[in-house]
Amino acid sequence: SDFKNKLVISDFKYHCTFILGKDKVIKSVNVFELILFGIYKLSIFIPLFLIFIRLLATNILNFLFEVFKSIYSILKILFVVRFKPIRTHFLRPLSVSFIMISNNILLLISSLWYWLRVGKNLLLSTVGDGVGRFCKFRLPKPLLIDLVWNFLLFCFLCDRNFFIEFI
């Protein structure tokens, strides 16, 4: 019940001793060997992390480009419709502007959806094949996964420390 792992610095020669419970010494290891072992273990995940960051950055740039393009188009249409004097056929330019605004909004939603789908598929492939198969075949519309992924991306963009603590 009172067996707890403890890490104790034994001397100033960069050695640490693992003590389990009631002062039972398990192993005294070199700190540098411990760091190298940790780097070796983490090096397995570095390629996956780099692929994830590259894909995320590419999709963020594409998504931001689509966002700015859509906002620019919407503002341009609204500015032209509002301040340009329309003498005849008022409904026609208004309907055209409405169609263009709705098309831009749909383009924005579709780019966001594509971004979420790519991130979700990457997340499922990194988590594991079993989870991916479960989410692909057991859930007909994995909207919950998309919402969770959107939340995680939002936390990552706003506060990376919260994202790391959440993971």
From Swiss-Prot:
Keywords: Mitochondrion, Plasmid. One of its GO terms (cellular component) is mitochondrion. Its main location: mitochondrion. It is found in: Mitochondrion. This is Uncharacterized mitochondrial protein ORF2. It comes from Ascobolus immersus. The lineage of its organism: Eukaryota, Fungi, Dikarya, Ascomycota, Pezizomycotina.
